[in-house]
Design a protein with these regions (language model features):
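FIC/Doc superfamily catalytic core
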Residues: 1-202
Length: 202
């Protein structure tokens, strides 16, 4: 932990790919904290943030995945079932972009209606984003970044007081994976959202 703090503060040089990943994540968090008022939530912004998250990496960032993935359907949001290999790669990427655009649009619609508490709207957006799994790598990191962005936009400037690395700590990540790992869990829409809101707001 001491070395992590020194790395973040540029007191030591990165020695591994993991160290570089920490610096990439730190830089994106700094950008979001300083420029959130001018950042629009949209597909293009999400791609740019993902690209920035991998700017020193051999992993190509800033592009939605174009490979199939096993995921179950949920009544909470209309997700695709990629268990078959019918979709072409281009269609997969196109469909993901459409999904992301849809949840971004829904976020703004709900915020403008001003009938639901901001934190619930943000939590709903984040769970939709995670379940879409738009990228090959670092979907959870992107969820942290988008959480910070949206909380800042709603004047919950948590990034000034804590690192959102703690938001998805190891124990909670395991809990989350277990919660949404079975088809039966997806079929219980209200159960899922209640559990997610409890997890998100705790």
């Amino acid at each position: 932990k001491e070395n992590l703090t020194k790395l973040i503060n540029n007191e030591i040089n990165p020695m591994s790919r993991e160290d570089i990943s920490v610096l990439e994540f730190r830089d994106v968090i700094k950008t979001v904290n300083s420029a959130y008022e001018d950042v629009k939530l949209c597909s293009q912004t999400i791609l740019e943030l993902h690209g920035y998250l991998h700017r020193y990496s051999h992993i190509r960032g800033g592009r939605y995945r174009n490979e199939e993935i096993n995921i179950v359907n949920s009544e909470h949001y209309q997700f695709f079932d990629y268990q078959s290999k019918v979709d072409l790669e281009a269609n997969i990427e196109k469909n993901i972009k459409k999904d992301i655009e849809n949840i971004c649009q829904k976020y703004y619609e709900l915020m403008n209606e001003d009938e639901i508490q901001d934190l619930i709207i943000i939590a709903s957006f984040i769970i939709d984003f995670i379940l879409i799994l738009p990228f090959k790598e670092d979907n959870i990191k992107m969820a942290k970044i988008l959480t910070l962005l949206l909380l800042n936009k709603s004047n919950y400037e948590v990034g000034r007081f804590t690192s959102l690395g703690e938001f998805f700590d190891n124990e909670k990540q395991l809990y989350f994976k277990n919660l949404f790992s079975k088809r039966g869990d997806f079929e219980k829409e209200s159960y899922n959202m209640n559990k997610w809101l409890e997890y998100f707001l705790s």
